[in-house]
Amino acid sequence: MATFGGFTAAVLTAAELNTAGGAWSTWTPTIASWTQGNGTVVAVYEQVGRTVNCYVLITWGTTSSGFIGTVSLPKTAARIGATGSAAVEDVGSFIATCAVNVTTTTLCAVTLINSAGTYGTQSALSATVPHTFGSTDNVRFSLTYEAAADGT
């Protein structure tokens, strides 16, 4: 008898097995402090049981403005605190190492990892930190977290 992740059935059905590792779903996240203009957002996720994996790529266009404040999650998180990897790219110049943190059960925030001191610290992004965002610059992250019991 097989069990799998958060599935409640003692024996997996073909339908349940087909959802594991299948195509990811898209969602439209709400992004605070950013005006999309002609920029683009790619946001995809998969949920297997209560485990949610997501990937987001936010690219500035010529009419985009602001910076990335918080980004809404595709599914409500069971708790705050999950951390994933992120990057901010000033195209043609540098890629800054960042983290993404679940800050509420519905939001995450990308933070810059500042290595200027003895220990790395996390700093909030702003309109000028780590640089002034322009066309083709991007913020991207991947994150894994546990969904709330109701799966919304």
Map each language-model feature to its residues.
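Surface-exposed molecular-recognition determinants
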Residues: A2-T152
